């Protein structure tokens, strides 16, 4: 790998902060790091890494909904591996992807820190993305008075306050019937692309009465059959039910976190996978406990063997739902589940049950 040319702005994004980068293969993303988000990722992943896969009773640990955290990258420096043994094993498995990450191109004298995360879009051919921000309360105790007042107004005047969630943005394949439903202020057409970006103004303009129509719009893909669209909605309903159960067991507080919906809009990939979707994302890295029996396979890892990052184009999912954005999240032992998040998930469940 070269250095500068291997980092580019993340192409597909429905909302969020500017400055998110990806590597040349699109396997990883590099997201500007906030101290609280970094600590949350480390704490959750260290706690849950041994039970990342769904347990026998069907529950899923919180980390199974989150992008895999791989470490920290400083501008002008190589990846800084975690000292935690559980994470170190994952870091070592990714050596082929990270050993040559010499630096992120520096654009200012002040060095930045980046979270190194699994790219949730990796493996999708034509991803369609929906970002749903959870919660009625949109600020934490550290927010300034000005931000508190501003976020209160946003909550009070949008579905955040009434329903516990708000559509933050979408990036979907162009569809004439969708464009006919949208005012020009709500979307941008990308030049030389078959995508449109639906901005936050659209989400803020939705009401209790029409927000379900906005979610229907997300699934209104001109390249997929009605049967495939119906399958997607039912699969996301199952995910929401499972995620709801996860959050009832978690003692955390998450402000302005989002659910990221992704589905495949390329019918050829649907055919390649025989329309078979997976409820949960595959582990980013296979974690085989019998490593000692597979020492002879070490040389194959660099070529994408079963113990390296998977070829998700042929083995991955046709859709996924993930929890993202933890700059204002923390573990809160003894305080019970997060009602601020639970209320929004309950409303989403009601909507998807009616599809």
Curated annotation (Swiss-Prot):
Entry protein name: Inositol polyphosphate multikinase
Changes seen on gene knockout: Impairs nuclear mRNA export, slows cell growth, increases cellular InsP3 170-fold and decreases InsP6 100-fold.
Any one GO CC term of the record: cytoplasm
Residues involved in substrate binding: 127-135
Function: Inositol phosphate kinase with both monophosphoinositol and diphosphoinositol polyphosphate synthase activities. Able to phosphorylate inositol 1,4,5-trisphosphate (Ins(1,4,5)P3) on both the carbon-3 and carbon-6 positions to synthesize inositol 1,3,4,5-tetrakisphosphate (Ins(1,3,4,5)P4) and inositol 1,4,5,6-tetrakisphosphate (Ins(1,4,5,6)P4), and then to subsequently phosphorylate and convert either isomer of InsP4 to inositol 1,3,4,5,6-pentakisphosphate (Ins(1,3,4,5,6)P5).
Binding positions for Ca(2+) per the UniProt entry: 271, 274, 334
Lineage: Eukaryota, Fungi, Dikarya, Ascomycota, Saccharomycotina
Outcome after substituting residue 131 to A: Abolishes catalytic activity, but preserves its nonkinase transcription regulation functions
Record-linked SUPFAM superfamilies: SAICAR synthase-like
Compositional bias ranges of the Acidic residues kind: 284-304
Highest taxon of source: Eukaryota
Region of interest: Disordered: 284-317
Main location: nucleus
Alphabetically ordered keywords of this record: Acetylation, Arginine metabolism, ATP-binding, Calcium, Kinase, Metal-binding, Nucleotide-binding, Nucleus, Phosphoprotein, Transcription, Transcription regulation, Transferase
A GO biological process held by the record: inositol phosphate biosynthetic process
Presence of keyword Zinc: no
Annotated catalysed reactions: 1D-myo-inositol 1,4,5-trisphosphate + 2 ATP = 1D-myo-inositol 1,3,4,5,6-pentakisphosphate + 2 ADP + 2 H(+); 1D-myo-inositol 1,4,5-trisphosphate + ATP = 1D-myo-inositol 1,4,5,6-tetrakisphosphate + ADP + H(+); 1D-myo-inositol 1,4,5-trisphosphate + ATP = 1D-myo-inositol 1,3,4,5-tetrakisphosphate + ADP + H(+); 1D-myo-inositol 1,4,5,6-tetrakisphosphate + ATP = 1D-myo-inositol 1,3,4,5,6-pentakisphosphate + ADP + H(+)
Protein species of origin: Saccharomyces cerevisiae (strain ATCC 204508 / S288c) (Baker's yeast)
